[in-house]
Amino acid sequence: MITLAALQMKSESGDVAANLARIGQAAKEAAGKGASLLITPELGLTGYGAGDVIRDLAEPADGPLVRRLQAISAETGVAIIAGFAEKAGADTFNSAVYVDGPAEPVVYRKSHLYGDYERTLFTTAEPSTMLFTHRGVKCGMLICYDVEFPENVRRLALADVDAVLVPTALPAGYSGTFIADHMIQTRAFENQVFVAYINHCGGDERFTFAGSSRIAAPDGSLLASAPSHGEALMVVPLNPADFLVSKSENTYLTDLTRRA
């Protein structure tokens, strides 16, 4: 079992220092509430709508920004998932990093870029299964649009993860409302995993965000939800053992791979 903190955040566009400070503040608050892992939104460190400046702010996965996240994690005792622009040679990836103090970071690169805005800024990564175990709970990461493809969540479920953790930048509108209110719980139920889907709130010079962050359980129930407006820090326990009955009743993964 772990206690997860999830920050629905108003990022400052192009202001990495301010966003890093906000994440540090949230990590301290999460520690005070007994959480051991904090998840934050897609590109939360640069701001999602910062445009071309995002490429200028990109850093390698072993750069000073990730090292600062590691320091915050070590200071607070809280592991952190943060979205950043990752520089790798000539490529810039839309990435999320998991840091747990001085341990080796785990980096996931977004494999399904959404729209011309993202495709202009970032290189498309190959679909990948980047896993880590946090305090005994096996986790995988996706980013925003990735979770809208059931194949991506199913791939992680077949790798036996307990939780799928999804930094996102979901725009406001009908589609955003549908995704938050229906798709996230469905992804959790059909794969019998926790799904944490953590969004921005407010807006920037290009986008208005839906807020509406969600944490869903393997039985499809909603463990926590954030409002459509304003920041929120949700703190919830994730205990796979609480949902063994659901897994025994809903044997999708077993039956999918069953041989006649």
Describe these PLM feature segments.
Residues P64-A79, E148-A232:
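CN hydrolase (nitrilase-like) catalytic-core segments centered on the catalytic cysteine
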Residues A82-F84, S95-Y98, M130, Y197, ...:
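Short beta-strand scaffold segments in enzyme catalytic cores
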Residues S36-L37, C139, A163:
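Structural motif
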Residues V16, G24-V107, P171-T186, E190-V193:
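Cys-nucleophile CN-hydrolase/nitrilase-fold catalytic domain and related Cys-dependent amidase chemistry
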Residues A61, K87-A159, A172-H182, N239, ...:
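Active-site catalytic loop in hydrolytic enzyme cores
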Residues M1-A6:
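Extreme N-terminal starter segment of soluble prokaryotic enzymes
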Residues A18-A27, V147-R154:
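Short, acidic/polar
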Residues Q8-S13:
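Short polar catalytic/cofactor-binding loops
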